[in-house]
């Protein structure tokens, strides 16, 4: 039996956002394994973690200290320890090339949109990802598109795997999930979108498409979740008053409320120009909700055959209307819903090191 140390020190970064959510779901699902012991480092070393939090210590420093401590301890004790780093960083060490490690690379947004990152941050990411490429760690990419982006800039990893993000969409999710049709609930027919402050999320494009769909009678409202109330108000200020009243900013909502909003929506909409995975779209798809998506590689990879791809602002609305009507009738299942089930994702992570151990045991 191996011990998996999950470096949840990412929680020290208060702006981790979606990456933190993914890490928490992955940790919960891996803990259900009966074959291996899985422990978060914040629980293995609660006093050290709490001291680091109070002192504002960088997670990179804490990861480096704890990783090297456990490397030395494992050498003396003979314990098989596997370290899992959920967000790109492999600690500095003089002890080998991280063959005992798994590191997750989510996306290369800083390469696609360098203007959003300082020069120091870009250099840091270049250095960290270059080290991951040269390491003996299992490097996990959250989509094939993300891996291809990585390999355009860095060397091909010695041990690379594509494992989709775990999608926890609550009880009753998956094939055949019973959802409202979005055709006339008490809250009206609404699109649902998650607001994000980065311009590449193309929120202006969402507003423009909603305006056209509303005028054609396809939907009544646009519901927006997340922060950014002031930004949303500024963006809709130029709309006609009647249309402006149809944009409903719901703010930060509970997990249960978010899933309820997904289930009642006429469609989920995301027109971003770059994604590494798009967890919100995957959550909606797992619940059987129609998707209106920008036509980018990762959306094609994940949602081809399920979602409707919006090629540009002048899109013909007739095919879109037919898609929504057909989806309401057929209620198709998303092809990757099982691949993204938390238990299936956890199994894939365990398989990475189990396969290496089996191969090593078979060698003479």
Predicted regions and their residues:
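Carbohydrate transferase catalytic cores enriched for Leloir-type hexosyltransferases
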Residues: 1-364
